[in-house]
Amino acid sequence: DIVYIYKTESGPMRMSSRVGLRSPLYCTGVGKAILATLPGDELEDIWTHSNVQKLTDKTITDLEELRSQLVEVRANGYAIDDEENELGVRCVAVAIPGADGRAESAFSISGLAPYMTPERIRRIATLALDARTDILADLGLR
């Protein structure tokens, strides 16, 4: 699971996530960003010990489909939650890898699905990747 440790809201709309809430790795942007940094055998172990369930009609419940998405996450550098955890919400997330390349933390930017167009997702992803570079530099990891 992931645990939300900080959250900032903007505007009157509220997402269901809140500080302290636990959510599954397999259907959240930050979860998928973290999973993409793990070796395949660890991913399989996590999957096997997870209570995988369909939270929305878009939730991934097939390990091979998740593996396929994680290949994209590694290639792009960011993960997308496309209404998999909460209907009407899309999320862009990037992991913060440690010195060994494995991530134990990540951050995300979420918005209402109609406003999170492919173009906006690309712009947000670019900003998030730039922020990750700055964070890693501040931590002395890059």
Residue ranges and their predicted role:
Residues 1-10, 123-142:
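Intrinsically disordered, low-complexity terminal regulatory regions
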Residues 4, 15, 117-119:
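Short acidic, gly/pro-rich beta-turn/loop elements at beta-sheet edges
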Residues 4-6, 26, 78, 91:
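Aromatic side chains
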Residues 5-10, 37, 49, 109-112:
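Generic beta-structure capping elements
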Residues 12-85:
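Short, solvent-exposed recognition segments
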Residues 17, 108-110, 136:
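Short linear Ser/Thr-Pro motifs
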Residues 61-131:
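Extended hydrophobic
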